[in-house]
């Protein structure tokens, strides 16, 4: 029930997760679901505690990227970067490594390190013309970082590539591309303006070779890895908006 409601009604999902915790707090799947429900409601301190509990129960490393993103949500991008440089990252599958790269780039941006964020996102997965579940989000994040750095032409190119790969509409890349092109969309049912709506163009596909080596944040850019189990559940800090 929690998983079904997270996207449609995150508040209701969170309420269900609290009930589930009261009934089965020793079940790892319940702790993980509670973590995602709290995460969806930006209750990052609570989410981090639940993810840590689930990981202790199972030893599963898959939650590592979202745990790092919780650190970002709590205003601790340095800790997120610590986690990006930890040995656990090499144990993640390809999707997990891409997710970790996205989190690390976000942490760099939190610290106003735009150039470092751009470099962090540059990877074989970004350049590949193979479309994977993570491709649209990776290209979108790269385009957004380029735009924030004032590199508008490059940003437009990568928003176009994100549009090409966004088969399920997981990003608003088409809207961002249209905005850069000066295109204004109107309501199709507005008879007075329907004939004036131009059509946005989509740029060319990316092309590059793929590589399979795992990515880990450069050791020079991160501090010594901390053991997440050293920190017990903390009173919830003010979450990032």
What are the roles of these predicted feature ranges?
Residues 1, 33-34, 67, 104, ...:
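Structural register within alpha-helical repeat arrays
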Residues 1-22, 33, 39:
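Alpha-helical segment of the N-proximal tetratricopeptide repeat
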Residues 4-5, 37, 68-70, 107, ...:
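Residue-level signature for tetratricopeptide repeat
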Residues 6-8, 41, 74, 111, ...:
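Structural motif corresponding to the intra-repeat A-B loop/turn of tetratricopeptide repeats
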Residues 10-11, 44, 77, 114, ...:
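TPR-repeat structural position
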Residues 30, 63-64, 117, 172-173:
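TPR alpha-solenoid repeat register
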Residues 208-241:
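Intrinsically disordered, compositionally biased tail regions
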